[in-house]
Design a protein with these regions (language model features):
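Bacterial N-terminal signal peptides
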Residues: 6-18
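Sec/Tat signal peptide C-region and signal peptidase I cleavage site
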Residues: 20-24
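Hinge/capping helix and adjacent helix->loop/strand transition within the periplasmic-binding protein
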Residues: 29, 35, 60-65, 84-95, ...
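An extracytoplasmic/periplasmic, membrane-proximal ligand-sensing/linker region
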Residues: 31-33, 221-228, 237, 247, ...
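Extracytoplasmic "Venus flytrap"
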Residues: 37-52, 74-77, 157-164
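Ligand-binding clamshell of periplasmic/extracellular solute-binding protein-like
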Residues: 50, 54, 76-79, 93-106, ...
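A ligand-binding cleft/hinge motif common to bilobed small-molecule-binding domains
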Residues: 101-112, 166, 170-175, 203-263
């Protein structure tokens, strides 16, 4: 074989090897795999309902289209599922957590949380907006949001001392200077809402499905309660923004400014802001075990980005969840996460003391 022919064969074979993908390159990371989709609250609740809608539509956007298997892991206010993801789940890319309020627990240093959530890869979060309402017959009468500062002493109902719901409304009320009695321990917002209807308590707050689905048609339109504000929502840079889900309402900071002519300030407001980002902007969070392969993290982030534009998913969500899901993905989500996880030790200590004071 002469030199020219040998050179031609060598070049030809080299080109073939370059344009022919290897079996590994052809096979997506998730092809033929199952993904355990861990939901940190019990079946039938809001987290479970939303999580299962996400799982149903997410798989088709993951290269390789794995099978997503929802699994409820309730307990300790949602912390049991978080501990499982951080301590037990294998970092093989085949476990995805879909959690309510993880960063709120980290910020409050919940004793039962044994893991550092900053070590768990962030995938995406879904924003949740909470609307606060009070009975209209609280003396001397609540007809509009700014009337709240005129209210005589009333009873405000929550779920537990260290829940994000209770923390946020207590901080907001203190900032406004309201006179109220704190009642907590209701098993759910359904129970608290019934207590409002019976006038056992006069205040509660709920997320979009509960507000749009029940409170608005049954209590607002009948004049029983008046919505006063929704908890603040922030941009990834930490700037206050209006919620497109409630164009007819104002945020807490907007109502405060209308009443007092200036924006709120101080450590309670800083604590409220951090709690709102942790519980509102990052109300539901998808995350993975520490050490998960980067290609798995990237694939799922891309899948959530595609899911956020999936009209079929959005239609299902609007039908069941009563709102248009708004995602924080990638760098935007990371910036918000850092604002919560890197709050000052002084602020963390203040929040813990604030919660403990309520127990006494």
């Amino acid at each position: 074989m002469n030199f020219a022919l040998r050179e031609f064969i060598f070049v030809f074979c080299s080109l073939i090897s370059l344009i022919t993908p290897s079996p590994a390159a052809e096979r997506p990371f998730y092809q033929g795999k199952n993904v355990n989709f861990i939901i940190n609250f019990a079946a039938g609740g809001p987290t479970d309902i939303e999580g299962r809608i996400v799982a149903r539509h997410l798989a088709k956007h993951i290269p390789g289209q794995p099978t997503l298997i929802p699994q409820n892991m309730a307990g300790a206010g949602g912390v049991t599922g978080m501990n499982f993801l951080g301590e037990v789940a294998k970092p093989d890319g085949q476990t995805l957590g879909y959690f309510t309020g993880p960063y709120n627990h980290q910020m409050m240093r919940t004793p039962s949380l044994r893991i550092d959530l900053i070590k768990l890869p962030f995938i995406a979060s879904i924003q949740g907006v909470t609307v606060c309402y009070i009975r209209s017959d609280v003396p001397p009468g609540i007809k509009k949001p700014t009337d709240i500062v005129k209210a005589e002493r009333f009873r405000a109902g929550g779920l537990s001392y260290d829940s994000n719901k209770d923390l946020r409304f207590r901080l907001a009320f203190d900032i406004l200077g309201l006179k109220y009695d704190y009642v907590t321990g209701y098993n759910s917002s359904n129970d608290a809402r019934l207590a409002v209807q019976r006038n056992e308590i006069q205040y509660h707050d709920e997320n979009i499905p509960g507000y749009r689905g029940v409170v608005e048609p049954q209590l607002v339109k009948t004049g029983i309660v008046t919505p006063i504000y929704y908890h603040d929502v922030f941009s990834p840079d930490g700037v206050l923004k209006s919620s497109p889900d409630f164009p007819e309402l104002a945020s807490f900071t907007q109502v405060y400014t209308q009443i007092f002519g200036k924006a709120p300030s101080g450590i309670k407001y800083e604590a409220l802001k951090a709690a709102n980002i942790a519980s509102g902007n990052m109300g539901r969070v998808a995350m993975m075990p520490p050490g998960t392969p980067p290609q798995a993290v990237a694939a799922l982030r891309q899948a959530f980005a595609a899911l956020s534009k999936d009209e079929e998913f959005i239609g299902d969500a609007m039908k069941v969840m009563k709102f248009h899901p708004r995602f924080e993905i990638g760098e935007d989500g990371e910036r918000l996460r850092q604002k919560v996880l890197q709050v000052s030790p002084e602020l963390v200590d203040f929040v813990r003391q604030f919660v403990e004071q309520a127990r006494k």
